Swiss-Prot record:
Homodimer. Its EC number is 6.1.1.14, 2.7.7.-. Gene3D superfamilies: 3.30.40.230, 3.30.720.200, Anticodon-binding domain, Bira Bifunctional Protein, Domain 2, S15/NS1, RNA-binding. GO terms for cellular component: axon; extracellular exosome; mitochondrion. Keywords: Acetylation, Aminoacyl-tRNA synthetase, ATP-binding, Cell projection, Cytoplasm, Hydrolase, Ligase, Mitochondrion, Nucleotide-binding, Phosphoprotein, Protein biosynthesis, Secreted, Transferase, Transit peptide. One of its GO terms (biological process) is mitochondrial glycyl-tRNA aminoacylation. This is Glycine--tRNA ligase. GO terms for molecular function: ATP binding; ATP:ATP adenylyltransferase activity; bis(5'-nucleosyl)-tetraphosphatase (asymmetrical) activity; glycine-tRNA ligase activity; protein dimerization activity.
Length: 739
């Protein structure tokens, strides 16, 4: 144990240097240049050598090998400390160091990716803003950070992503959809744990009141100090140790660090207030009296849990079943950033799959068992390994994924995300380590996408066990359970209190109900203990809802009897896939954004047709009136077929109009040209956005072709196999005018 201890407290960078071979130490360009605490969601500043696309797989692995070793050694240390039942403070420090080393490894992996694999974010964001996909809310008043308005194109894309979600999950799985209020009384969120645990530490500029998240500000300040050439090796090592443990500091420890490192406001240079705990929920009061505090909901899940009994009744009392809700949630982020990735109001789509804890098998798992996807298990993370592509069925068989219900939803999530435009090669499922788990979860896998910000969580798939239902049942005294028929009846011994309602009512008046409710939910062990006190002392004391009551023999006795059971009560476990639709949208933007080869100014989004904001455009080649009947005919037919489309009859060249529609991701384009007008049967061209190839078909056929393409019933390859490629017009403007 003593030989392991120095690694625990030494600066992480120094520890890593000790693990590097001399050959790499002689090549400083290959060493890590970013601070250890660089988060996986922070923009990566690539080292010169590592950013070259010429670094091959073997060369990259040579750089990564010592970092993997450092993570593996720290993971071994964490395991040993836990096995030896070391003090919790030592375990926490070791875990913090492990997380820091993981971040270093991941940052380096991202830095070594090919240069052409990184989207030009500035160019993409310019396109999004210029074409009004979305923009900052209240912009003409200066805007409010963390709040966004979606324009026509962004709104259509978002609605299509939601509609695809409904079809993929709610319709396919026959999930029960509900729509609950966004206002939530305080007791509900007190019970769920959000009031006590949903908080961050915050500091304020003492002069202008501007707020900053304390850990983020301290991290940025220390990174700035460490980048100074005058900063000594000892000082850097000290600051790296601070950064490695940043997640574990309490309020007073953070306050001391702000003083020690003289942290000021990064905007004004003013002094900062001491850190205070800041709850991330938006607080309000329900009703004019101000007597009922409440919050805007931080998640949609609680509404489903509170309606569990009604949903169970709707499902004829049977398990398993699932309920879902799509709606807005709110988190009062201290310093929102990174566009749609961290906002204060966001749309969520959540599923709560209620299942018997003894029967966590999904009958449809074989439908997804053969999928191959990248899995990043907790074991791989602490061993310094990368995500590994695995067959989903093998992952469940080998115990990487706990059960087929969780495995089934991971597979369905993968299929949905790739359907809406997320690249399978930039998508992984990462298992939470034990110290990362939310207060309500016993296992959790996040779908993470690789973006220019690094790996970001876009979907969480948590096994919430029976946490929420049990908490709400205890708080409300309402049993949130399902009844499970027994294969054979069984006889059980029952022990319960038998209260004397008259005596209790006389003694405690209006509080008698509290006493009766408490006695009704006591378990056998507690009742037996209180019975002994009754026999010995003639009384015992109970405490409920902050009040104490003394009960005597004339108020209560204990009843024992046998009971034959035909059903047993089960508190269901809950598997919860939770989708952040804003983050999914942002990932789709990055993964589908392209620049036309040979023309840096022509950008386009290759949205899959199923979610494209417009399925096709209708483009008359000329403004001649003879073209207008065909425009009208096509537009009306497309509408009848349920195909969203955009008519562009402006005077610009056809190439420029193609570029405009490509820029907003219109999947296909119908062009009415001179052959359409001059020849019978009347035909028009259909253009594919991504390949820019065109076919020619009769005008009457085109709406159904576009509909089938948009619904995924056929592919562009199918269309090209059935219809002739368009090579060029056979007639021109002159013939049209003469006619």
């Amino acid at each position: 144990m003593p030989s392991l201890r120095p690694v625990l407290f030494r600066g992480a960078r120094a520890a890593l240097l000790l693990l590097l071979p001399p050959r790499l130490l002689a090549r400083p360009s290959l060493l890590l240049r970013r601070p250890l605490s660089a988060p996986s969601c922070a923009p990566i500043s690539l080292p010169a050598a590592a950013s070259r696309s010429s670094v091959d797989g073997a060369g990259a692995e040579e750089v990564l090998a010592p970092l993997r070793l450092a993570v593996r050694q720290q993971g071994d240390l964490v395991r040993k400390l836990k096995e030896d039942k070391a003090p919790q403070v030592d375990v926490d420090k070791a875990v913090a160091e492990l997380k820091a080393r993981k971040r270093v490894l991941e940052a380096k992996e991202l830095a070594l990716q090919p240069k052409d694999d990184i989207v030009d974010r500035a160019k993409m964001e310019d396109t999004l803003k210029r074409r009004f996909f979305y923009d900052q809310a209240f912009a003409i008043y200066g805007g409010v950070s963390g709040l966004y308005d979606f324009g026509p194109v962004g709104c259509a894309l978002k609605n299509n992503i939601i509609q695809t979600w409904r079809q993929h999950f709610i319709q396919e799985e026959q999930i029960l959809e509900i729509d609950c209020t966004m206002l939530t009384p305080e007791p509900v969120l007190k019970t769920s744990g959000h009031v006590d645990k949903f908080a961050d530490f915050m500091v304020k500029d003492v002069k202008n009141g501007e707020c900053f998240r304390a850990d983020h500000l301290l991290k940025a300040h220390l990174q700035k100090l460490m980048s100074d050439k005058k900063c000594s090796v000892e000082k850097k090592s000290e600051m790296e140790s601070v950064l490695a443990q940043l997640d574990n500091y309490g309020q007073q420890e953070l306050a001391d660090l702000f003083v020690n490192y003289n942290v000021k406001s990064p905007i004004t240079g003013n002094d900062l207030s001491p850190p205070v705990s800041f709850n991330l929920m938006f607080k309000t009061f329900i009703g004019p009296g101000g007597n009922m505090p409440g919050y805007l909901r931080p998640e949609t899940a609680q509404g489903i849990f509170l309606n569990f009994k009604r949903l169970l009744e709707f499902n004829q009392g049977k398990l398993p079943f699932a309920a879902a809700q799509i709606g807005n949630s709110f988190r009062n982020e201290i310093s929102p950033r990174s566009g749609l990735i961290r906002v204060r109001e966001f749309t969520m789509a959540e599923i709560e799959h209620f299942v018997d804890p003894s029967e966590k098998d999904h009958p449809k798992f074989q439908n997804v068992a053969d999928l191959h996807l990248y899995l990043y298990s907790a074991k791989a993370q602490v061993s310094g390994q990368s995500a590994r592509k695995m067959r989903l069925g093998d992952a469940v068989e080998q115990g990487v994924i706990n059960n087929t219900v969780l495995g089934y939803f991971i597979g369905r999530i993968y299929l949905y995300l790739t359907k809406v435009g997320i690249s399978p090669d930039k998508l992984r499922f990462r298992q939470h380590m034990e110290n990362e788990m939310a207060h309500y979860a016993c296992d959790c896998w996040d779908a993470e996408s690789k973006t220019s910000y690094g790996w970001i969580e876009i979907v969480g798939c948590a096994d919430r066990s029976c946490y929420d239902l049990s908490c709400h049942a205890r708080a409300t005294k309402v049993p949130l359970v399902a009844e499970k028929p027994l294969k054979e009846p069984k006889t059980v011994n029952v022990v319960q209190f038998e209260p004397n309602k008259g005596a209790i009512g006389k003694a405690y008046k209006k509080d008698a109900k509290l006493v009766m409710e408490y006695l009704a939910i006591c378990d056998e062990c507690y009742i037996t203990e209180m019975e002994m006190l009754l026999n010995e002392k003639g009384e015992f004391t109970i405490e409920t809802e902050g009040k104490t009551f003394q009960l005597t023999k004339d108020m209560v006795n204990v009843k024992r009897f046998q009971k034959t059971l035909y059903v047993e009560e089960v508190v269901p476990n809950v598997i919860e896939p939770s989708f952040g639709l804003g983050r999914i949208m942002y990932t789709v933007f990055e993964h589908t954004f392209h620049v036309r080869e040979g023309d840096e100014q022509r950008t386009f989004f290759s949205f899959p047709a199923v979610v494209a904001p417009f399925k096709c455009s209708v483009l008359p080649l000329s403004q001649n009136q003879e073209f207008m009947p065909f425009v009208k005919e096509l537009s009306e037919a497309l509408t009848r077929h349920g195909v969203s489309h955009k008519v562009d009859d402006s005077s610009g060249s056809i190439g420029r109009r193609y570029a405009r529609t490509d820029e907003i991701g219109v999947a296909f384009g119908v062009t009415i040209d001179f052959d359409t007008v001059n020849k019978t049967p009347h035909t028009a061209t259909l253009r594919d956005r991504d390949s820019m190839r065109q076919i020619r078909a009769e005008v009457s056929e085109l709406p159904s072709i576009v509909r089938d393409l948009a619904n995924g019933n056929i592919t562009w390859a199918d269309v090209e196999a059935r219809y002739p490629l368009f090579e060029g017009q056979e007639t021109g403007k002159k013939e049209t005018i003469e006619e």
